[in-house]
Amino acid sequence: GELVEEGTLFVIDGEQHGYVEKSKKDSCYFAYSDGEPFFWIGINLCFPTAYEISSGSEFALSGNVAYLGLRQYESWMKKCAKHGVNIVRIWLGHEYWSPDTENTYELDSVKLSKIDKLVDLAKKHSLKLKLTVEQFRYFDHDKKSVFNKHLCHCGVPCESIRKWLSNEDYIEAWMYKIGELAKRYSGDTTVAMIELWNEMNAVGGEADLIMEWNKRILPRVKALFPHQLVTNSLGSLDSEGIAKFYKDFCWDDTDALQIHRYLDQGAPYKICGDNLIPSIKEAFSFMRTKERPMLLAETGAVNNCHSSEFKYYSADDRGIIFVDCVYTPLFVKSAGCGNIWHWDRRYVESKNLYKYFKPLRKLVDGVDFTSEAFEHLDLSTDKAHILLLRGRKTTLGFVRNKSDNWMKTLRDMREPEPIDVHIQTSGKGINIIPIWKYDTDAFTFLADGVTIKGLRYGFLFKYES
């Protein structure tokens, strides 16, 4: 062709690192397309708060609900970004976001526009998104519920999960929806992960069918979202039956292995009703893999058998459940922090716990998780949890007074007994990162480490080898 005009192209380095993917250097962690490490500091912000609408009479309700919606997300995302969060999870199947109508192949353009606006908000606050496509568990065309689905194909209602999972018409209709989402977001680096379903085993006793569906669908979704992480999730790992589902699941077809675990005194596994730190350690030990990143994708505390949010949340002004849930996974070689549930007025928002992301962010900033070849160590004593992540150049640590637990501090309303702790180091000066103010009587820095006198709660630390 004809040269119209000759010039010089200047390329300027920017802050865009590409997509979030499994690290090519260490498959236990995430990195951007350009190799820059990405340590996942996430939270569930799955759906907006529903506010019941007045009927116009004093104290009377209409039975309908309204949402602040995107305005509420603006507030949440602003707080998250300010305190160090870098990724949030959204349930696209919730009625506020879901583009589904009651007919297959008919999508709601208004709902798709809301998702577009959500992506714009995430960009504005430099946050990544994990999009969970579905969370429904049954079909009941006479009932309204967050876990219910109304869907027809060619005018005929779908009446069972079995039919939805096995019928080619419904499978292809669902893939059409995924294709429409892919047209909008598969080329967008803000979208880091596509999760097919929230706790898919909860749809009922269709284990073989669920496995078959996932083995077939996960590769097809990955083909539509080749640059995003693609995975799925299962319910809380708290019983032998669920544990078998976790072990048998086709994680080899995913880009990340996800665990859900809560403090739940009604769980068949008794460890789930005790202290969160050993419970989280046990879950990661059970599912340990070197093939792909692991995440504690849902965590927190619930009343027996997930009947409601934890009754002692109201007493947790210092966020001790938050800290133990969110911080612990890092020290068992998770690819990210624990992603807390109950993000809204049930816990995180009402107690203003966003600030506790900051110490964690300060700890991980500047650490190249993909190059350290980290190993996790447990040096706990009878009085303190002492968890280390030791790498080639950097060691990260988490110390918690064992008496500062939910049973003593929240239920019994007793102050923890102060303890003395010595942290031995083999490198340069130790950097103490406080979590709570007025936590200790004194830090004494010695040639071989640091001695802490009168530790009430806990702290983070790191040092260079």
Outline where the language-model segments fall:
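Ligand-binding face of N-terminal immunoglobulin V-set domains in extracellular IgSF glycoproteins
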Residues: 1-12
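Active-site mouth of glycoside hydrolases
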Residues: 14-19, 23-268, 278, 289-290
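Catalytic-core region of carbohydrate-active enzymes that cleave or remodel glycosidic bonds
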Residues: 127, 217-229, 248-348, 355
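Short, electropositive alpha-helical surface patch
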Residues: 142-155, 312-317, 354-358
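Aromatic- and carboxylate-lined catalytic core of secreted/periplasmic carbohydrate-active enzymes
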Residues: 293-294, 302-304, 318-444, 453-464
